Design a protein with these regions (language model features):
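Kelch-like beta-propeller repeat domains
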Residues: 1-208
Length: 208
């Protein structure tokens, strides 16, 4: 274990990627950290209110940040251009918020996406959780109530095209480990509903 840098701020569950010898990361404020020199540089802020637990993908010198949530869950996204130091809204939307989804980037433009919150259920929960006593009721509900995504699908980052590769109620997870080994795909634990974690490790063979 090696400490690469000490920062006077904290960032949790935002966007990030490695590009060349640098780490680019942020939540609302954006930063670029040089792994060789230790230099930290402020970059252009995320253009709207910060979002947590979205999907970050590096494609053609741009970081795509999809979905995520704050006081509501989103299906749109923004891309950051490293050369121009600016953000632009992405032309397409993903099928659901991808809040808490797991991903595997197969190649430059194709990403596997597993699980993720249901946008409508999340947005309603933000309202309902303001009511006294509802929190206990919310966390006691069964997983069927939350309607998390049961699909594994392939997203083309370039044009937003979606190909559904599989559907199973056991895929309805958030925060799962998702690993590709040869032609096998391993799904490791993850939450099956808020506050409850699945114990299983699933093996999906020859998904593509």
């Amino acid at each position: 274990e090696e400490c690469l840098g000490n920062f006077d701020f904290e960032i949790e569950s935002g966007y990030g990627c490695k590009i060349d010898e640098c780490l680019f990361f942020g939540y609302k404020q954006s930063f670029q950290f040089n792994l060789l020199t230790g230099e930290l540089i402020r970059k252009k802020d995320f253009p709207v209110e910060g979002r947590a637990q979205g999907v970050s993908v590096l494609y053609k010198n741009e970081l795509y940040y999809l979905g995520g949530a704050n006081h509501e869950a989103y299906t749109n996204g923004y891309k950051y251009n490293f050369e121009n130091d600016d953000w632009k809204k992405i032309d397409y939307r993903v099928p659901h918020s991808v809040l808490g989804a797991a991903t595997i980037q197969l190649n430059e433009k194709e990403v596997l996406i597993l699980g993720g919150f249901n946008q409508d259920v999340y947005n309603q929960a933000i309202i309902d959780l303001k009511q006294p006593g509802y929190r206990e009721e919310y966390f006691s509900k069964g997983k069927e109530f939350f309607k998390w995504n049961q699909e594994i699908y392939l997203l083309n980052i370039e044009n937003g095209a979606i190909t559904i590769l599989g559907k199973d109620e056991r895929f309805a997870l958030c925060g799962a480990g998702f690993i590709k080994v040869d032609n096998n795909y391993y799904i490791i634990s993850g939450e099956c509903s808020p506050g409850r974690r699945a114990a299983e490790i699933l093996l999906v063979k020859e998904l593509i």
